[in-house]
Every structure is written in structure tokens, then in C-alpha cells.
Curated annotation (Swiss-Prot):
Pfam families the UniProt entry points to: Coprogen_oxidas
Site (Important for dimerization): 183
Name assigned to this protein: Oxygen-dependent coproporphyrinogen-III oxidase
Annotated HAMAP family: Coprogen_oxidas (MF_00333)
Catalytic activity: coproporphyrinogen III + O2 + 2 H(+) = protoporphyrinogen IX + 2 CO2 + 2 H2O
Superkingdom of origin organism: Bacteria
PANTHER family for this protein: COPROPORPHYRINOGEN III OXIDASE, MITOCHONDRIAL, OXYGEN-DEPENDENT COPROPORPHYRINOGEN-III OXIDASE, MITOCHONDRIAL
Pathway(s) this gene product operates in, as recorded in its UniProt entry: Porphyrin-containing compound metabolism; protoporphyrin-IX biosynthesis; protoporphyrinogen-IX from coproporphyrinogen-III (O2 route): step 1/1
GO molecular function, one term: metal ion binding
Any GO BP annotation: protoporphyrinogen IX biosynthetic process
Residues holding substrate: 100, 116-118, 266-268
GO CC annotation: cytoplasm
């Protein structure tokens, strides 16, 4: 099992380089991804041990802020967020390895994107370790372009169908349900793929699906960035982007399993919260004008079948 974990780690660290390099090629000023390598030592007072590399870009003309973060951590006991639906795992030791990214563009016409790919092994120090993969990618637009959502979902469907034709409808629905703000009765964006507890096939089959899915993120996102990054925008557009970013913050702090897991397990706070947008705003009881571009987005982000 250790060999398989290391193989996934090698894939993720190479993917991190591929993604940051591809994104930097679209940046038009001197902003670059900066590498922040960290390590939590094996000491008795640390709940979580391990290491990682958070790559951050800030202040770009195209990417106002972005993080592509790798981590490999282990602990003596899974936190409550990881065992809420699997009580049989309570008290087990664990290893978790993953890559998580969030990209916040400056231009309101370029959507925010998020992706995460991970493996968990519970009871890795026992004769019968329990493994599962999780991950996916999702898109959060501020202004609607139907062709962008279609391209995003078509890319997701193509990679799923290569492995299992039941995956796309199942993981698309799961994504719509997961990235939903109950207190707002709103979806965070137009969704994509979300899966967890993936171990329905052999390890190698699941590994191949997850790595193919991870490799397709750039195919899904880069064409949208290239198409929208030079669209002129007004202060009104920017203000609406900042207002909608507030929903992103609310979801991450209230519902996101990765954030909750990291904080409950004593993870590295700076890396866990690096996905937050650089600026977000809240307006009391604000409502968009009827018929405005801003009002349209609330219909646009409702779950639908994007691929006819």
C-alpha cells in the first residue's frame, strides 16, 4: 500500500507543476506561483504529521489569487468529519494525500475554478487497510456564458465515459448537491464532478480514473480563461464578482469537508485557508435588478442538464 500511495504522490506533485506552469503562461504581468514547502514534525503534541507544498500566486493581472496545494499527512485517529457517515472508521489511524486548487481570476467574466484529488487510507498500519479516492472539479461563474458550462461539463463527461458511463450522471448530481448553500438556497456555481468513497473497482482502475480526471482539469478550464480574460468590464461587474465571492467564503467555512477536516485534524491553517478569495464583500439584503445580467446568474447556476 505504501508503494501505491507514493505513486499517487508522484503523480500529484507532477500535476501541480503542470497546472501552475499552464496558468502562468496566461498571466500578463510578473506574478508567478511561489512555492511554500512545509512540514509538521512527528512530535507527540501534534495531532497531524506530514508535509506539503502550497504554491500561491497573488496580484496577477489575470489571476488575482490562486493556490495549488499538495499535502501528505497522517494521524493516529480520523477526525469526526471523516467518520460522520462511516462510524466503523472511528478511532482508526489514517494517511491522506491530495492536491487541492482554487483559482480566483481578476476579470469578473472569467469564472473561479476549484479542483481536488485525494486518497485516504484508514488503518494503514493494520493488515486490512481501507482505501478510497475522492475528488472532482467545479466551476463558479459570475456572469453566464452557456458555452463555457457546456464545454466544462462535456470535458467531465468525456473523461467519465472513458471509464464508466454511470460516473458522469452520478458524480454530476453529487456535485450539484454538494456545492449547495442551504442557508441561501443557492448552488455555488454550475458544478462539474464530485465523488468520494470511490473504491467500487480495483485500486488500479480507481487510480486510473482519478488521474485521468485530474489531467482533464486544464482541458476544461484553460480554454475558458483564454476566451474570457480580455473582456472589458466595469466597476459594476467587479462589485458583483466581489459580492458573489462572499458565497464562496460562506461555503468554504460552513460546508466544505476539506476545510473542516483540515481544521479538526490540526492541519496547517495557512494552507487550509489559502483558497479564500483576496477580497469579498457582503451587502445587506441586496437584490439584483430585474432583467439585469446579475439576475440572470441566479437562474444560470441552478442544476440542469448541460449536455443535451
Amino acid at each position: 500500500m505504501q508503494e501505491k500511495i507514493s505513486k499517487f504522490e508522484d503523480f500529484l506533485t507532477q500535476l501541480q507543476q503542470n497546472i501552475t506552469t499552464a496558468l502562468e503562461q496566461h498571466e500578463t504581468n510578473a506574478a508567478k506561483f511561489i512555492s511554500d514547502k512545509w512540514q509538521k514534525p512527528d512530535t507527540h503534541d501534534q495531532k497531524l504529521k506530514g508535509y506539503g507544498n502550497s504554491m500561491i500566486i497573488e496580484g496577477g493581472e489575470i489571476f488575482e489569487k490562486g493556490v495549488v496545494a499538495f499535502s501528505r499527512v497522517h494521524g493516529s485517529e480520523l477526525p469526526p468529519s471523516a467518520t460522520a457517515k462511516r462510524q466503523e472508521l472511528a478511532g482508526k489511524s489514517f494517511i491522506a494525500t491530495g492536491l487541492s486548487l482554487v483559482i480566483h481570476p481578476r476579470n469578473p467574466f472569467v469564472p473561479t475554478s476549484h479542483a481536488n484529488f485525494r486518497i485516504f487510507i484508514a488503518g494503514a498500519d493494520t493488515d486490512n487497510p481501507i482505501w478510497w479516492f475522492g475528488g472532482g472539479f467545479d466551476l463558479t461563474p459570475y456572469y453566464p456564458f452557456e458555452e463555457d458550462a457546456i464545454h466544462w461539463h462535456q470535458t467531465a463527461k468525456n473523461i467519465c465515459d472513458k471509464h464508466d458511463k454511470t460516473y458522469y450522471p452520478k458524480f454530476k448530481k453529487w456535485c450539484d448537491e454538494y456545492f449547495y448553500l442551504k442557508h441561501r438556497d443557492e448552488c455555488r456555481g454550475v458544478g462539474g464532478l464530485f465523488f468520494d468513497d470511490l473504491n467500487d473497482k480495483s485500486f488500479d482502475e480507481c487510480f486510473n480514473f482519478v488521474t485521468d480526471c485530474a489531467n482533464s482539469y486544464l482541458d476544461a478550464y484553460i480554454p475558458i480563461v483564454a476566451q474570457r480574460k480580455n473582456i472589458e468590464y466595469s466597476q459594476k461587474h467587479k462589485d458583483f464578482q466581489l459580492y458573489r465571492r462572499g458565497r464562496y467564503v460562506e461555503f468554504n467555512l460552513v460546508f466544505d469537508r476539506g476545510t473542516i477536516f483540515g481544521l479538526q485534524s490540526g492541519g496547517r491553517t495557512e494552507s487550509i485557508l489559502s483558497s479564500m478569495p483576496p477580497i469579498a464583500t457582503w451587502k445587506y439584503n441586496w437584490q439584483p435588478e430585474l432583467g439585469s445580467e446579475e439576475e440572470k446568474v441566479y437562474q444560470y447556476i441552478k442544476p440542469r442538464d448541460w449536455i443535451k
